Amino acid sequence: MEDLNIKLNAHFAGKVVRKDLTKKIKEGANVPVYVLEYLLGMYCATDDEKSMNDGVQMVKKILSDNFVRPDEAEKVKSKVKELGKYTVIDKIGVKLNDKKDIYEAEFSNLGLNGVPISSHYVKEFDKLLAGGIWCIVKMEYYFDEESKGTSPFSIESVTPIQMPNMDLEEMFEQRRQFSKEEWIDVLIRSTGMEPTQLEDTVKWHLLERMVPLVENNYNLCELGPRGTGKSHIYKEISPNSILVSGGQTTVANLFYNMSTRKIGLVGMWDTVAFDEVAGITFKDKDGIQIMKDYMASGSFARGREEKNASASMVFVGNINQSVDVLLKTSHLFDPFPEAMAYDSAFFDRMHYYLPGWEIPKMRPEFFTNEYGFITDYLAEFLREMRKRSFSDAIDKYFRLGNNLNQRDVIAVRKTVSGLIKLLYPNGEYIKEDVEEVLRYALIGRRRVKEQLKKIGGMEFYDVNFSYIDNESMNEEFVSVPEQGGGTLIPEGMNKPGHIYTVARGKTGMIGTYKLETEVVSGNGKFEKTGLNSDRDAKESIDTAFRFFKANNKNISGTISTTTKDYLMHIQDIHGVGLTGELSLAAFIALCSGALNKPVQSQMVVLGSISISGTINKVEELANVLQVCFDSGAKKILLPMVSAVDIPTVPPELFAKFQIGFYQSAEDAVFKALGVE
């Protein structure tokens, strides 16, 4: 047995289990891991191979005899009737029957309801009223002809499959026996993964998945490829979290039911996780609004009352494209449904964006065969730690930089607090430990902010997150690994007739457009593709061609509009809808193609012209320049009329470009082609 296993068994006897046993039985039994490990903990808490094998056989026997499979429900009911008494393992929920003034249990797999249950179980295990819990239930059967209308089934005893109590002080004491690296491995093995097969960054991501279970009102988003185990921990590992599969949900179910006056899932569970975020829809119009209110403050108003709850929110979903493509053409929150995808206020409430693409797809060798905590013990530890806070752990050693606003600070503090609860639950940490956690927290929040900048523009411009050492006063900046994704506009020379412009699209978002022009022998025809049926875009391209026909001799006597055909394709790279501000870019593209001379490399031309040649000002210059920068532009051609708006642009953004100004459309052509 390896050292860590020996250590675990020595310091946490009876609270650890060999995870390959879970795996072996799990593959054949459709029960949550925490139910399985509860039984394994009862019968297999030993390192003696023979006793362990006997224990495994015992657990298998219990599962085959007592675990209720939905298709065998009638068979089990018959057993209860014939034997008079029988023990079952099932998920039971309880409702109050106010007409009879009794509590009635509902069996999930057995399909029984209306079974009377003693009120003392309900008081002791209030989760029975909130979605139900897995229990070992001793049932009795007694049919009385006189008491018609009542169920012949009754409940003799209920044993919830969860830890009865948790001694945190003992946990703190034993934590001292393990190094940081060992403790991380123990936590990861407790969730069923094998840390020796994983890189350090992946280990940190797996720990981050646990933060919503240990921190109150924590909002986490994880989007990534399929098969990376995004929802596993919330569905299988913790009995205190609920996974809401993507699809329609209601305010009553999630928050508060006005008619029954019952609080919804956020009041019953420690974590509410939404699987497949792309499918989230609310029946109620105000659903997203209430969710935003809850994510910001931990409270929500329904009717006349304001309710508080402490459940964390987790959003997991799939990214169907590569991250590079997504960053170039859209933003990392793109998989969210349309009602949320461009709602910057909603995403600003996310405390952390976990990059699911950095976690490998799960393969058999990633699952552990070593010892880890019984899932229930781990879940109870996480639950108890919710009552504590380490959000001030930063202050002793560091200050946060001035680019972080109040929401950023709250997000970073919550992440730091959650990770310290997991790694140093006894509060025994040093400066380097805090710095490591702080850097990780800043990166995840900056990833949120970078996307907000793409969605909401200049309002979220401050993304240069940093922290300052209280002793040395050194300022350290953190960056996001995938930041280098934004080169839609490639380096090197374009082909003649190709040009980029940035403008506001039909959806209200600012996007990048590429115009490609081909000039072939012909008789003066002009064809345009890529416009679909967009009237404004068509008009602006037609304006450009009419202006080109009327004014091409001002550019060069060699241009012909009678012996050549012009073909133009317009591409909406960001997918934000076409724009009516393409006229100037189209005019320059036509001249560039006709002269067979390329536009300067990595240049974006801004502005538009009317049929008479009047230059129109660029609206929202700062936001437009931000999109230019994100798209990879190095040179900008601006109309002189926009010079008055330059003070609205942050100096550090303005300094990123070589900026040229033009007075007229002809002037713009010469400057774009680099001709003096």
Curated annotation (Swiss-Prot):
Which controlled-vocabulary keywords does the entry list?
Antiviral defense, Hydrolase, Protease
Q: Which Pfam families match?
A: BrxL_ATPase, BrxL_N, Lon_C
Induction entry: Part of the pglZ-brxL operon.
Q: Does the keyword Transcription apply?
A: no
Gene3D superfamilies according to UniProt: 3.30.230.10
An example molecular function term from Gene Ontology annotations: ATP binding
Question: What GO terms in the biological process aspect are recorded for it?
Answer: defense response to virus; protein catabolic process; proteolysis
Cross-referenced NCBIfam families, in alphabetical order? BREX system Lon protease-like protein BrxL (TIGR02688), Lon_rel_chp (TIGR02653)
Task performed by this protein = BREX systems (bacteriophage exclusion) provide immunity against bacteriophage. Part of a type 1 BREX system. This system allows phage adsorption but prevents phage DNA replication, without degradation of the phage DNA. Methylation of bacterial DNA by PglX probably guides self/non-self discrimination. When the brxA-brxB-brxC-pglX and pglZ-brxL operons are transformed into a susceptible B.subtilis strain (BEST7003) they confer resistance to bacteriophages SPbeta, SP16, Zeta, phi3T and SP02 and partial protection to phages SP01 and SP82G (these include lytic and temperate phage).
Q: Which family does it belong to?
A: Belongs to the BrxL family.
Q: What is this protein called?
A: Lon-like protease BrxL
